[in-house]
């Protein structure tokens, strides 16, 4: 069920969107459209009790790269937004755990991410500002992805 919702659904929707975009003329901004997928820090952060979720999000990351490579010559950039700990209903039941992690500095920006943070990342990628980019992953995780010792 998790794989169907989190991986197959976005893959099939992206394929439908790409087919539609391919039928369109290239716009003045040089694109036919943009495909943006939402993954999670779980794409590359192991959580044994959420293995299927992690696999599905890692799959989204690979899907983004495959589609980016396939669609680059057709003027359709493809991007991934990878949120960290975002304050939503999904994270409410583990709020105390994440509050402690934030306090301990696991997330360098030391705050919860907000849905508006993710929306701003999507808006940036959809804006057409990044005219020579595709296949990129935009981390919206308060610096969590930065490797540290």
Regions from the PLM with identified roles:
Residues 45, 123, 134-149:
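Short C-terminal tail/terminal secondary-structure segment
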Residues 72, 77, 133-135:
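Short, small/polar-rich loop/turn modules that mediate ligand/substrate recognition or access, typified
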Residues 40:
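Residue(s) in the substrate-gating loop at a strand-loop-helix junction
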Residues 19, 69-70, 131:
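Alpha-helical segment proximal to the catalytic Tyr-Lys
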Residues 14, 56, 64:
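Active-site helix of classical SDR
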Residues 1-4:
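Active-site Tyr-X3-Lys motif and surrounding loop/helix of classical short-chain dehydrogenase/reductase
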Residues 107-118:
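A conserved structural motif in NAD(P)-dependent oxidoreductases
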């Amino acid at each position: 069920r998790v794989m169907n919702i989190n991986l197959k659904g976005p893959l099939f929707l992206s394929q439908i969107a790409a087919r539609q975009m391919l039928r369109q003329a290239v716009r003045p901004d040089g694109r036919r459209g943009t495909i943006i997928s939402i993954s999670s820090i779980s794409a590359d952060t192991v959580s044994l009790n959420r293995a299927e979720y992690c696999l599905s999000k890692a799959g989204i990351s690979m899907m983004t790269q495959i589609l980016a490579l396939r669609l680059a010559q057709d003027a359709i950039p493809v991007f991934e937004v990878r949120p960290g700990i975002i304050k939503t209903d999904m994270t409410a039941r583990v709020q105390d755990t994440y509050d402690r992690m934030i306090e301990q500095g696991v997330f360098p920006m030391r705050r919860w991410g907000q849905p508006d943070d993710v929306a701003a990342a999507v808006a940036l990628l959809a804006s057409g500002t990044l005219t020579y980019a595709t296949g990129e992953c935009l981390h919206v995780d308060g610096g969590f992805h930065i490797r540290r010792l």
